[in-house]
UniProtKB/Swiss-Prot annotation:
Domain spans labelled SH2: 148-247
Comment, domains: The SH2 domain mediates interaction with tyrosine-phosphorylated proteins. However, not involved in the binding to phosphorylated BCAR1. Required for cell cycle progression in response to INS/insulin. Required for regulation of EGF-induced DNA synthesis.
Name of protein: Breast cancer anti-estrogen resistance protein 3 homolog
Modified residues (N6-methyllysine): K329
PTM sites of type Omega-N-methylarginine: R437
UniProt modification remark: Phosphorylated on tyrosine residues.
Residues recorded with modification Phosphoserine: S32, S72, S77, S176, S284, S353, S358, S370, S466
InterPro entries: Ras_GEF_dom_sf, RASGEF_cat_dom, RASGEF_cat_dom_sf, SH2, SH2-Ras-GEF_adapter, SH2_dom_sf, SH2_SHEP1/BCAR3/NSP1
GO cellular component: cytoplasm; focal adhesion; membrane
Known outcome of mutating R743A: Abolishes interaction with NEDD9
Amino acid sequence: MAAGKFASLPRNMPVNHQFPLASSMDLLSSKSPLAERRTDAYQDVSIHGTLPRKKKGPPSIRSCDNAGHSKSPRQSSPLTQDIIQENPLQDRKGENFIFRDPYLLDPTLEYVKFSKERHIMDRTPERLKKELEEELLLSSEDLRSHAWYHGRIPRQVSENLVQRDGDFLVRDSLSSPGNFVLTCQWKNLAQHFKINRTVLRLSEAYSRVQYQFEMESFDSIPGLVRCYVGNRRPISQQSGAIIFQPINRTVPLWCLEERYGTSPGRGREGSLAEGRPDVVKRLSLTTGSSIQAREHSLPRGNLLRNKEKSGSQPACLDHVQDRKALTLKAHQSESHLPIGCKLPPQSPSMDTSPCPSSPVFRTGSEPTLSPALVRRFSSDARTGEALRGSDSQLCPKPPPKPCKVPFLKTPPSPSPWLTSEANYCELNPAFAVGCDRGAKLPMQAHDSHEMLLTAKQNGPSGPRNSGINYMILDGDDQARHWDPLAVQTDEGQEDKTKFVPPLMETVSSFRPNDFESKLLPPENKPLETAMLKHAKELFTNHDARVIAQHMLSVDCKVARILEVSEDRKRSMGVSSGLELITLPHGRQLRLDIIERHNTMAIGIAVDILGCTGTLENRAGTLNKIIQVAVELKDAMGDLYAFSAIMKALEMPQITRLEKTWTALRHHYTQTAILYEKQLKPFSKILHEGRESTYVPASNVSVPLLMPLVTLMERQAVTFEGTDMWENNDESCEILLNHLATARFMAEASESYRMNAERILADFQPDEEMTEILRTEFQMRLLWGSKGAEVNQNERYDKFNQILTALSRKLEPPSGKQAEL
């Protein structure tokens, strides 16, 4: 550059400036010793332009000028002497010199070389340290805020960074863009583990990304790393590699990527969940050199590639079309957008994810709720016709907005005799509006009679999610006028078909003081030692499967799934308690279900904390309880009792028993692994409303009832505050899942009943085991004959203190341990 642009300048002519030409040329040379000594003087040099810029104010005195600033020429530097020797002035005496802008040789100007490498070299350590600190101060869920994340570095570089066993770092996968790799050293060997990335599509409009190695999945990579580092958990069972020492980066991510030449190209959408917010960019319908210019103007070295949007509406992040073929210059307007223009074919390297088929980008403010929704233009629109006007006039008649809450299940078509407004709270006669009850239907008499018989046998009919056909319940003598067989029915059958309004129960089905027990005296004190010992012996002497069968049998009776009489069905208005808990008059049943669940959880906790013997005895009791939970989950399908056991095991009074859990891992290793790897993740799935995805309905006899009844009766439960899923960021989505599960439970109540009967077909109950598992017995055992009648809130608060005292008695807290 120096030889080409400044070779024609005179060397010995007097020039009225403070610096010789060589001073300005020194800025352009990457090998000049002067430039190396004064990098700090050019920190504010911009790399975004190639034209010289004039500084405001008096010229600054540079640190390299030690001899003062006079108009007399300075001693030439070696670089200046070389230039003069190459181009002597006497050889060019006859030439005419045409100078450029007079400010070109002004010493206050700085020439900038547009060089990425020079820009990196000019960055001082203080500036890099400041940028690194800015990255580390981001949100803890942002991958860039963790120093063990090194971005896009090569595999060999990562292997050189881990030197000792336990060292680890996380980097981007260069062979599989969008994925991440954990590099660590174990047994003096560098190992690479790909972090599996799974996209869970909870609905058409919402999806989430989870990361995992083998078993448990996490919502973010920082959460995954924290779990494996904090618990010293092996990355894989085969390798046994354990990570505990992070290798931290010392420079910003962009510097690492530029240093190793691994700056990402297009298609880095894979890590959207971890990166920066999207940047709104305008689009263009022109192609050519502007595409390449826009490509080079994009910031490089980011963790994430920015998704492109159009106008003011949020584009769908799952299916963003590669906009390389269609870009919009900044000076162009959206006034002339052709309809039906055909996109150029995509190259194989481009993203081939499905995208909306409309060639016109959305520019309004209507949100995209589902990637599957495609704009439909009217058939009379001609191909290539231009739409003129503002953004709101791109479509003559905007399509209707989709429903923001997608239907989880298509409702069944209503029956001819049921109105669309019929619901559980309306027990009205089931004739269509405007239908004359006395009118005969000669053409449909036979068909209607067959429909009545079918409804009497099968139960569910019409849009109601009930097992009882309300036409039969609501029918009266006038409705029978067109039924050919109604005249032949006797009075007894007429009584059975008469409508009986459902009863609003106000008294609990649990009456501890009226409970006749063979093991308890008429009056007993709370937590009697002899009775606790006898109950523990029964629990120890029976097999885990037998105990699970007894629990299922009692649960089915409490939830009114089995052994429900016809009178009880008529008083409920439905055929199953799974339907009743979804209805307004099922409040008392919901309270009873909550009572049994909490009482059962407290009883299991007392069974563990009441072991005053050796540490091995407590570990054995814990092992037996976990085995019962496995049987309830796999063999019995009793998710209600399973959740009660998991609630007991996750109480703070139980989880703090470190010695007990350590003894369980030593003596019952397989059980401990089963609890950590299978039961806890499965319990989390249940409480997030995803059991329909992971649990086949044919294997469930008693579904998970607690989320629904707790939502409907929140003011009655203060034992544990909010549930675990209510503190989740996706609590609204989980709430919708629980409500959809409640609808499914009401519809599939008959299926649950058949599953329970099949599982308990050959069951022979033991009287004493059945008694100790009944709610009335447990209430009297825990609170005594007098305390069992006290209000729920008082009973739970007092017993919470009792459990805390028992836990501290078994394993006294250390001085540094926080209180429960």
